[in-house]
Amino acid sequence: MTAMHENQPPVQAGPVRRLTADDTEGVLRIVDLEELDSANLARELACPDDYMWMGVDLPEGRLGAVHRSMRWGDHLLLKGVFVDEPLRGSGAALQLAFALRDTARAEGYEGLAAWVEPHKPEAALAHMLRLRSTGPLVHRFDVPLPADGPYAVAATARSNGRLVMEPVTSAPPLVADLLTGDAPGSVRWVHDRHRLVLSGFPAASVTDLGQVLAAAAPLAKAVGTRRVELPVPAADLSAAFFLASLKAHRLSRTPVRLGRADFGSTRPGHAAREPKEQVRA
């Protein structure tokens, strides 16, 4: 990456464009994400209905900034912006964020979603995108699936969908679906690199984790992952200790909230899509 000289005006980014397989080398040069290799990137770039990669170029034509997002239920989940050194301070991150919002609206998404750490810089961007806090403060845990277990294999799992788990008790879920507030036991899922990401914790207690993993395992196995990401209330210290004992990995040091911006009624000609996969466990 090239350093900018002091007192030199910021480099102006080119127009926002949708990225394709031809941008693979440029993306991997800028984006540093665990488990995002050329194979995972190729899979996402080949599924524009499920993953939205957008970027802007430097004046010489080289990729200068990238934003990654994905379909999660009927919302576009913003996963992160990566800006090369020459474009830092240019407003490229904000340019990409607003372009993603406009594209999502035009393509029939019901809104935007993003995990927001309240006291981090991204909270300001979330405010500019009018993302409103949804649900409790949570910690996101990356939980390994047990190596064994009588797991059925989901027949045609794709990149996202809906998982319905029969409630173990009549008690409410530990974290209700943060995207829709659907009936207990129903959550949205999306395939994010090496893990399956759930939009809630559909069981009543963290001690019911085994049932949740058993329900998610067929999907995870079908898409080639061995880990599941789950939100757990940040105030539930016993849940955090329980998950730590299972070698679950907490994805951020401080709690996060799901920020959500709903577009309102779907635009004419862009009907909301049904989830590609609905699996009942």
Which residues does each PLM region occupy?
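Active-site rim helix/loop that mediates acceptor-substrate recognition in acyltransferases
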Residues: 3-5, 31-59, 162-183
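A short beta-loop-alpha structural element at the N-terminal edge
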Residues: 13-27, 154-172
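Conserved acetyl-CoA-binding loop-helix of GNAT-fold acetyltransferases
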Residues: 83, 89-102, 206-218
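Conserved GNAT acetyl-CoA-binding A-motif
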Residues: 104-117, 222-232
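Conserved active-site alpha-helix within GNAT-family acetyltransferase domains
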Residues: 118-136, 234-252
